[in-house]
């Protein structure tokens, strides 16, 4: 390796002896030793992002033990030993007359509540009339005559016969020759292919006590299921009370009539 000294006044270049590899290695080691304390100081001044110490690695997140006893500080046990309970924020004896009366009243209320619930269930069941045998006390799903009959099925779709969905959710295409509901048996005439509401022998339709749809007069559906009601543009809205509104204010429910757009006539300019 040849090194050249700085240029002097003259343009002559004097070659110098090359530096040996041993001297270069010694110089690099000395510079590294001098920079070590500075690095240690910088590292000590910085906060570590994570604790890599062996003690920290040994520690594991222990699962918190569940309380076996809710009485942590032993206060309830102390009250039991002294035969005392809390009553409306006051300490009274557990065997006092007030506590006994409250317990008796609470038990009496629970028994009355349960009795009323059983009465409601019994009244609802007695008012139910089976569509198949016309006997009160049970529905068609619990009718013993339906279980004996092979033609009548329960829990199936009357349109396609599937047990995975209801009749209202069926999307199957049915042959009109088989009827609207091929798997349904009429309760009135006993034939397959239609429901009792569409039976020609049933003059009352779905209105067992008489009546008809108030919109179209049909007896095969209720007012809520009427097609005219679904296709109508009438919307029932409920107004809101605003601050400062008059008590005599009434909402106008009439739908405004749509105005037809005027056709533009070409303008003629005469010169």
Curated annotation (Swiss-Prot):
Amino acid composition bias (Basic and acidic residues), ranges on this chain: 22-33
GO cellular component: nucleolus; nucleoplasm
One of the Pfam families matching this protein, by short name: zf-CCHC
Membrane-spanning parts: none
Superkingdom assignment: Eukaryota
Bias (Basic residues) ranges: 56-65
Tissue: Detected in brain cortex and in testis.
Keywords: Metal-binding, Nucleus, Repeat, Transcription, Zinc, Zinc-finger
Annotated compartments: Nucleus, Nucleolus; Nucleus
Function (record text): May down-regulate transcription mediated by NF-kappa-B and the serum response element.
Name of protein: Zinc finger CCHC domain-containing protein 9
Region entry Disordered, spans: 1-67
Positions of CCHC-type zinc fingers: 128-145, 155-172, 184-201, 211-228
Gene expressing this chain: Zcchc9
Gene Ontology terms for molecular function: nucleic acid binding; zinc ion binding
Origin species: Mus musculus
Compositionally biased tracts (Polar residues): 7-20, 35-46
InterPro entries: ZCCHC9, Znf_CCHC, Znf_CCHC_sf
Signal sequence region: none
């Amino acid at each position: 390796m040849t090194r050249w000294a700085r240029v002097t006044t003259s343009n002559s270049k004097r070659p110098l002896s090359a530096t040996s590899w041993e001297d270069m290695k010694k110089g690099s080691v000395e510079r590294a030793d001098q920079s070590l304390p500075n690095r240690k100081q910088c590292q000590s001044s910085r906060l570590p992002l994570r604790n890599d110490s062996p003690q920290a690695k040994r520690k594991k997140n222990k699962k918190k033990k569940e309380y076996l006893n809710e009485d942590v500080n032993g206060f309830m046990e102390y009250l039991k030993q002294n035969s005392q309970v809390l009553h409306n924020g006051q300490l009274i004896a557990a065997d006092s007359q007030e506590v006994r009366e409250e317990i008796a009243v609470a038990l009496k209320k629970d028994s009355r509540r349960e009795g009323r619930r059983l009465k409601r269930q019994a009244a609802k069941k007695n008012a139910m009339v089976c569509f198949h045998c016309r006997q009160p006390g049970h529905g068609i799903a619990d009718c013993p005559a339906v279980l004996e009959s092979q033609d009548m099925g329960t829990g199936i779709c009357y349109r396609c016969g599937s047990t995975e969905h209801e009749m209202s959710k069926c999307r199957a295409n049915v042959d009109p020759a088989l009827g609207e509901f091929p798997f349904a048996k009429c309760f009135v005439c006993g034939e397959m292919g239609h429901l009792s509401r569409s039976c020609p022998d049933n003059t009352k339709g779905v209105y067992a006590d008489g009546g008809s749809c108030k919109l179209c007069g049909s007896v095969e559906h209720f007012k809520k299921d009427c097609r005219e009601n679904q296709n109508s543009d009438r919307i029932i809205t409920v107004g809101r009370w605003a601050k400062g509104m008059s008590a005599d204010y009434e909402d106008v429910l009439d739908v405004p009539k749509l105005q037809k757009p005027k056709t533009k006539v070409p303008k003629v300019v005469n010169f």
